[in-house]
Regions:
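Short, glycine-/small-residue-rich phosphate/pyrophosphate-handling segment
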Residues: 109-152
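Short, surface-exposed loop/turn motifs that are enriched in glycine and acidic residues
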Residues: 122-126, 162-169
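A short beta-to-alpha transition loop/helix N-cap that caps and shapes the active-site region
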Residues: 41-44, 127-129, 158-160
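Short, solvent-exposed coil/turn elements at secondary-structure transition points
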Residues: 38-40, 124, 153-156
Length: 242
């Protein structure tokens, strides 16, 4: 199997350690590709809309995004990690996710995404990790992923692993290993189930794209939906099973 990891920081702190513990269960049976932000996607999205209007290859940062996109599409499991900064994911993670706006269901979602699983790992000193995880989940779910595991925690005492109490270290280790075992025992030869919320999103966007495509057959998103057969009877979660 293939695992693609997007690290929201280059720092090797508590989040990094938790990620390493999660991956330990997979190291003998998976090809793991990791990206570190901002190094592997260093620039901000400038909102030019080229990706949505002209195609993702016209993005000024295509040299970075195309490589990562390929890894994401080839992955059976996507792991996204980020420490919590002021109740949110890192700025580098937000900048990364902005580059993939064209992959949202209202635009040109990849059918492969609808059969994938994903895991989000985040923590913080105090509160805020849940809202940070929500930042990432928002994009993953709008990419079409239904099966998303989430690990969050409030450290409270310190942000350095070695300075945490043994009790806290044991608690974090136990929880992340439990999540790892859960995802390690999945049969990745079978696509994940697409939930009703995701299907509803597709249904709503299909009506929108059908109307737009009728009035402007050359509009990129509408053409994509038509080519995929989604304006007819085909659906993204059926496409990726074929």
């Amino acid at each position: 199997m293939n695992i693609t990891v997007i690290n929201g920081t280059e720092k090797h702190g508590v989040t990094y350690r938790l990620k390493e513990m999660f991956l330990e269960e997979f190291k003998d049976k998976a090809n793991i590709t990791e990206y570190y932000l901002p190094k592997d996607c260093p620039n901000f999205c400038v909102g030019c809309l080229n990706c949505t209007l002209k195609g993702e290859k016209t993005c000024k940062d295509a040299e970075y995004t195309e490589k990562i996109d390929k890894s994401l599409l080839e992955a059976d499991l996507i792991v996204m990690t980020s420490p919590t900064y002021v109740f949110h994911a890192t700025g580098a993670m937000k900048a990364f996710l902005d580059h993939f706006a064209y992959r949202w269901i209202p635009h040109r979602p990849a059918p492969e995404m609808f059969g994938k699983r994903a895991v989000i790992i985040t923590q913080c000193l105090g509160s805020g990790s849940k809202s940070a995880a929500k930042d990432i989940k928002h994009s993953l779910s709008w990419w079409g992923i239904s099966k998303i595991g989430i690990f969050t925690d409030a450290l409270m005492s310190d942000i350095v692993w070695e300075k945490l109490s043994r009790k806290k270290q044991a608690e974090l280790t136990g929880r992340i290993q439990k999540l790892s075992r859960k995802f390690a025992h999945i049969d990745y030869t079978k696509p994940a189930h697409t939930n009703l919320i995701t299907r509803f999103k597709v249904f709503f966007c299909r009506m929108m794209q059908k109307s737009i495509h009728k009035s402007d057959p050359e509009y990129l998103d509408g053409k994509y939906w038509a080519e995929q057969g989604w304006l007819g009877k085909n659906r993204p979660w059926r496409t990726q099973k074929m």
